[in-house]
Amino acid sequence: MKVISALLLLIVIVATACDAVIIRDQLNPIPQSASPTLVIIPTKETVLDATYSHQLGVEVIYFAAGCFWGTEKLMQSIPGVDAAVSGYANGLAEIVPTYEQVVSGATGYRETVRVEYKPDVISLDALVFAYYHVIDPTIANAQGYDVGTQYQTGIYYADDAARETVERITAIERQRNESFVVEIKPLERFYEAEEYHQ
């Protein structure tokens, strides 16, 4: 019962945390004349997640659920989650993204949270169900008041075992919704967001 109450409380936090982003962006909009500077990477090989060091007894999954601040707070509150780190996933291989580039909508990156969890405490099934409980899987490129390609929902997995679990739970969720636009893909690359987003 405590877990359910905590999840419901966190849904409220998720819903309200992202509103602050809209207000902040409206107060300090990026000028129309501003163009993001692209940082070119010499190769196009898959980066995956160079900032993550695998730990014994810990697994990892990546959730894009709109604004990453609310998702990060939600995941951090779940027992068995060791860490939730905001970042950017699966965009153009040619750039190392910054927040300004991602919000421009030109990079293909999604605001994403890397969730490091202990499967002997919390199952991936439970995390995926919690994820689907807080998103609207029927809306592309938006969640709540946050609109843009960076807010596209998605689950990005790092191995076949996670893929099988994600696909199984997603099949259940697809039956509940006539329209379903959540990306289910392997992780191609992930970069941690700037420190002020953590």
Where are these regions (language model features)?
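Bacterial N-terminal signal peptides
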Residues: A6-A15
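Flexible coil/turn and secondary-structure edge motifs
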Residues: C18-Q198
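Positively charged n-region of N-terminal signal peptides that target proteins for export
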Residues: M1-I4
